[in-house]
């Protein structure tokens, strides 16, 4: 087995004609490890309905979706919007702002959103909602076999991310998770990527980063990782990943060898 920095196992990452030696794979969570629509689409619909039910407001719950980049009617998200690229705190603040702008007092809006989030999270069927992107489980398995470290950097809260990974049966293959609550500046700032690399004891220059948003790509670029790979489920999302070195549609296009 080849050895990389500080004697750690080194893998060879192949994507089409691109070949890179890596000590770690770093993944975004939502839209990269897990299908975004399945995980957050239903959650967003439930959240907006629950929020509307908690305040004296005659508006359409679906209209609040515009504040987070969620089209409830077409069941589609904006890959550049808060739901896709923002932290949970930012998403909740955006919904509360939408309520406030429609006439709900700010303190009531905040209370309604916080309570709705707790209620929805408690009622979600997480095993059904957490659908790994095609090929990602095989890639993680190959990483474990090759001794290549795996990290996750997410705009979600760390505890929620750990729960999601555990429910999906992936937690044992991930060496470190950095959520938005563990850093002072989230993606596109490089801080989360640097933090996960420190936790994995690898240099960013020896890591590959996979992400589905422009924030992911820019964070990896600024952190100085060896290769930034965009994960684009649709042409619309691919158009936002122009700063990536490579763009894939799923992980069946990725090969990791010892």
State where each predicted segment sits.
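Conserved phosphate-coupling serine/threonine residues in phosphotransfer and NTP-handling enzymes
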Residues: 32, 154-156
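Residues that cap or flank secondary-structure elements
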Residues: 87, 131, 153, 184-185, ...
């Amino acid at each position: 087995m080849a050895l990389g920095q500080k004697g750690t196992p080194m893998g060879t990452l192949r994507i089409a004609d691109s070949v890179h030696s890596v000590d770690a794979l770093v993944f975004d969570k939502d839209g990269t490890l897990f299908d975004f629509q399945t995980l957050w689409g239903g959650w967003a619909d439930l959240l907006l309905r629950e929020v509307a039910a908690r305040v004296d407001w005659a508006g359409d719950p679906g209209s609040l979706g515009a504040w987070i980049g969620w089209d409830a009617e077409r069941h589609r998200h904006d890959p550049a919007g808060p739901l896709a690229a923002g932290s949970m705190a930012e998403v909740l603040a955006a919904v509360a702002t939408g309520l406030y702008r429609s006439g709900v007092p700010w303190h009531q809006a905040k209370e309604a959103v916080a309570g709705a989030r707790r209620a929805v999270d408690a009622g979600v069927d997480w095993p059904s909602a957490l659908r790994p992107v095609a090929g990602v489980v095989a890639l993680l398995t190959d990483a474990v076999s090759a001794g290549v470290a795996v990290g996750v950097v997410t705009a979600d809260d760390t505890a929620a991310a750990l729960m999601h990974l555990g429910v999906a049966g992936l937690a044992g293959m991930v060496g470190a998770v950095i959520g938005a609550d563990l850093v002072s500046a989230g993606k596109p700032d490089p801080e989360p990527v640097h933090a996960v690399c420190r936790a994995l004891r690898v240099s960013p220059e020896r890591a590959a980063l996979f992400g589905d948003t422009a924030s992911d790509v820019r964070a990896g670029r600024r952190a100085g990782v060896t290769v930034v790979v965009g994960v684009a489920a649709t042409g619309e999302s691919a158009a936002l990943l122009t700063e990536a070195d490579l763009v894939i549609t799923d992980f069946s296009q990725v090969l990791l060898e010892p």
